[in-house]
């Protein structure tokens, strides 16, 4: 499927399509994904960092110097964050603070192949995936100052605007993010800040791991629940905190 030039053109700043990527869902959300076989991308305004979606919070200047709001463009974009990080204490504590997280594994190729609707004649304008670039605050501010409305909104292609959603402050570089992006051209796909898409999890995902802080009995209980829902993907527990004691010799 990646033989389609238009699809390959919508992969931004990514060379290895078989790079493993991960995401932590809540147990409740992942259970819903198993049953519904659907995945939701959210409006960038719901992202946490105040500098996120910075372009959409600003005005841009026309070539004649007139300032215009980018809020209309804001309404038509949705995204979902993934990471190259296999296991991270910070990620578990942020996204699974109640020990109710599920880390899933896939690849850029598997995720985007399922997401990109090649039957849609406007697919090249709507479905994208890219690696986040981390920049100093001053670099971002210089980028904003030099950006015009024409730079990002005109020309018929979504790539320049998509790249603005792939910029984040360098303080967050540890997140090592990859973002799935959707441009809702007709404005009728999303609802209440969420755009839902088919998600063939049994084809896309290769691994499911539960929170490393669960006890063995808690892990077995949650594992059985997922299996009962129909999850056929191997389910393990993150070994982030596993420690095998070693005897110390006193010579």
Description of each model-found segment:
Residues 1-251:
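Partner-binding and oligomerization surfaces adjacent to conserved cores of proteins
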């Amino acid at each position: 499927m990646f033989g389609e030039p238009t699809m390959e053109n919508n992969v931004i700043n990514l060379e290895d399509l078989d790079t493993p990527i991960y995401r932590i869902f809540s147990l409740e959300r992942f259970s819903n994904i198993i049953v519904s076989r659907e995945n939701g991308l959210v409006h960038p305004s719901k992202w946490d960092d105040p500098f996120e979606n910075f372009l959409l919070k600003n005005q841009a200047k026309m070539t004649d110097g007139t300032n215009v709001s980018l809020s209309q463009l804001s309404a038509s974009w949705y995204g979902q964050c993934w990471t190259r990080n296999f296991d991270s204490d910070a990620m578990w504590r942020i996204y699974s603070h109640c020990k109710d997280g599920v880390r899933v594994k896939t690849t850029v190729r598997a995720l985007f192949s399922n997401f990109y609707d090649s039957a849609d004649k406007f697919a090249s304008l709507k479905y994208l995936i890219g690696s986040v670039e981390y920049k100093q605050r001053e670099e971002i501010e210089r980028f904003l100052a030099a950006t015009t409305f024409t730079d990002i909104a005109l020309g018929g292609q979504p790539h320049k605007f998509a790249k603005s959603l792939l910029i984040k402050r360098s303080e967050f570089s540890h997140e090592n993010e990859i973002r799935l992006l959707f441009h809702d051209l007709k404005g009728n796909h999303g609802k209440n800040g969420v755009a839902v898409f088919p998600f063939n999890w049994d084809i896309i995902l290769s691994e499911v791991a539960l929170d490393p802080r669960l006890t063995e009995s808690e892990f077995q209980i949650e594992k059985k629940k997922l299996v009962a829902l129909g999850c056929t993907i191997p389910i393990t527990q993150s070994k982030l905190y596993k420690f095998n004691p070693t005897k110390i010799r006193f010579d």
